[in-house]
């Protein structure tokens, strides 16, 4: 198995566990150039809030969308948008990525700004 297939297998297992909990989930996707975060309803059919380094407000203030500082800004924005949508508690779905670097920075920034998981 290659790295990509292994990551997808881990993500599938995690999402199955979160689906059993019937909780709203904070889903993170990391590409080489950007980072994306979505708050998805417990049923999995609606996106309640989203933030990424592609947003105009975020993009203008960053030199690069693929570093820890950019991830922290996205974490702060997703927490603010989730709270505005009435979401306080989420399950963290790291999409099979290691809890390290950009993924960790996004999660910690979201926690500091009011999301609990």
From Swiss-Prot:
One of its GO terms (molecular function) is 5S rRNA binding. The keyword Ribosomal protein applies. GO terms for cellular component: cytosolic large ribosomal subunit. Pfam families: Ribosomal_L18p (PF00861). The keyword Ribonucleoprotein applies. Keywords: Ribonucleoprotein, Ribosomal protein, RNA-binding, rRNA-binding. One of its GO terms (biological process) is translation. This is one of the proteins that bind and probably mediate the attachment of the 5S RNA into the large ribosomal subunit, where it forms part of the central protuberance. HAMAP family: Ribosomal_uL18_B (MF_01337_B). Belongs to the universal ribosomal protein uL18 family. Part of the 50S ribosomal subunit; part of the 5S rRNA/L5/L18/L25 subcomplex. Contacts the 5S and 23S rRNAs. This is Large ribosomal subunit protein uL18. It comes from Neisseria gonorrhoeae (strain ATCC 700825 / FA 1090).
């Amino acid at each position: 198995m290659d790295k990509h297939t292994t990551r997808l297998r881990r993500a599938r297992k995690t999402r199955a566990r979160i689906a059993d909990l019937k909780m709203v989930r904070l889903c993170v996707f990391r590409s080489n150039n950007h980072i994306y975060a979505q708050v998805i309803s417990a049923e999995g059919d609606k996106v309640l809030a989203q933030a990424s380094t592609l947003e105009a407000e975020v993009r203008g203030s960053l030199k690069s969308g693929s570093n820890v500082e950019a991830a922290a800004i996205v974490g702060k924005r997703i927490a603010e948008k989730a709270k505005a949508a009435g979401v306080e508690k989420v399950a963290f779905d790291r999409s099979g990525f290691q809890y390290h670097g950009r993924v960790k920075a996004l999660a910690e920034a979201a926690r500091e700004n009011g999301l609990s998981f």
